Design a protein with these regions (language model features):
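Acidic/glycine-enriched edge-of-secondary-structure segments
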Residues: 1-5
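C-terminal edge-of-domain segments
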Residues: 69-74
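Short acidic loop-to-helix transition motifs that present clustered carboxylates
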Residues: 56, 172-175
Length: 176
């Protein structure tokens, strides 16, 4: 995943026809340049999310010159389903048996900012606990596909698609 940060980078990315999948724009931000970018993105069918200044600050790779008005996500499509995520390839994290929503959320956020292409969560969570995990992730699920389901099935699908499986665990007894 690559991020384009600020009006200049996002505009250049659009002009160069990069594979922008999502645009995050600061709610209430207005300028002629920004309007032009948003029109171009909309015309190309690129999903646009309006976020708070805090959202933009958290998601931005560079705040050295202040919080940018706009960010663009290039390459990674957060709307992919599990099969599409596997087909797209890349690095997919699997959290198997994680029990605490906050820990799951931190892992989702870490995967997102480290450049992973998707996250699979195999955990027994209620809807309330899933919402808590998404909140703890700083709502990173908006920017990376997060799949909730059977981890073993996901591993089998990934292996069948040629993925190399690397496992890190501390108490497991099952070899995948």
């Amino acid at each position: 995943m690559m991020q384009r940060c600020g009006i200049t980078e996002v505009s250049q990315s659009l002009e160069e026809n990069e594979d922008i999948r999502l645009v995050l724009v600061k709610r209430g931000a207005e300028s002629e340049q920004l309007a032009k970018i948003l029109t171009m993105a909309s015309d190309r069918g690129i999903r646009i999310i309006k976020g708070s200044e805090n959202d933009i600050w958290r998601m931005s790779r560079d705040n050295s010159e202040g919080v940018p008005e706009i960010l663009a996500l290039v390459g990674r499509d957060p709307t992919l389903d599990l099969d599409e995520s596997i087909e797209a390839g890349g690095l997919i994290w699997l959290l198997a048996g994680a029990a605490y929503p906050v820990n799951i959320g931190f892992c989702i956020r870490t995967a997102e900012v480290s450049g992973a292409d998707a996250v699979i969560v195999d955990a027994e969570l209620s809807n309330t606990e899933r919402k808590a995990a998404k909140r703890a992730s700083m709502k990173a699920h908006r920017f990376i596909p997060v799949h909730w389901g059977d981890g073993l099935q996901a591993v089998k699908k990934a292996k069948d698609s040629g993925f190399r499986i690397i496992s890190v665990e501390d108490t497991g007894t099952l070899s995948l």
